[in-house]
């Protein structure tokens, strides 16, 4: 059976699975730190690389390999390297492909911890990073130097759901001799396939939609075998490895990914449309709305707007924007107050004081993250119950 001839929904259920001699129908969980050899000669061959096979779960593990193969099939990638977290996926990508003195151009509209990694950690190791507008291609072009190795973007971005032209940005990167890295966390392969649009590398925080129920931490880097070889080399040495148990959970999550993402997107579009009509809302950010600045571009790259909706709360007289945002968040009874996203449960957070709290005020302003901004990762509850939980917005005029 040639598995890749099937539709993506079928691949999410069937791709990557390997059966043991016991004939299990669900992927096996290999909770092993190491693997036995038949002889000293075989051990030497495995360690020397002349014979394929498992050695130690920091290097490879059968359950992790099945997860990697399934996600690679869904993203159309030659190879996937699974990591312990989404942040370690970014770190492994950069450390595998860049050296001291190299230059990275990154969107300023990215996750706050990603900004910290680029600005505070990698800079100490001699990497230069320039932050530019996600949507201004001229800024990307102007930022290129003779040492530029990577372009890094989130599209849609966190939390303002800005969208970049992946094909156009890939063209600029390739002409500069650089690789385009796309964090596809918000969309997943169920909604967007960056490699097909010209990107070279995909980053995932598997913690989010791939898990789908807020249980485990994990990440992934995907791309060609040539690009993934040094990324895997860093992982094997540094040990930022995905655990077998977490990989097993993510395998189960991938089986329902397409069904869940459809439901998340339907709920998110309905909620965003409703929010635009509420007097307590000053502005809504959702790429599935025709009012979104990059709506046409988003719909040409994505099959839907995804599950993340952000909006600015309109403050009442005598109330600061942050006070207005916090009042709304504290008034919710159903939606969970937490910074995670991609869960079946809807979550709500105030980016300026949570996900982007360690970013400088100047950087937040440049990224458009204002004090009245609220982000909701729309879950799988009934839409009427979500609207009811946000009913405070109907009386905030």
Per-region residue spans from a language model:
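Conserved PLP-enzyme active-site core in the AAT-like
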Residues: 2-3, 12-21, 79-279, 285
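Conserved N-terminal alpha-helix of the aminotransferase class I/II PLP-enzyme fold
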Residues: 39-88, 113-120
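PLP-dependent enzyme catalytic core of the Aspartate aminotransferase-like
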Residues: 119-120, 128, 142, 315-319, ...
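Short, well-ordered beta-strand elements within core beta-sheets of diverse protein domains
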Residues: 250-259, 307-318, 375-379
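Conserved small-domain helix->loop->beta segment predominantly found in fold-type I
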Residues: 269-345, 360-365
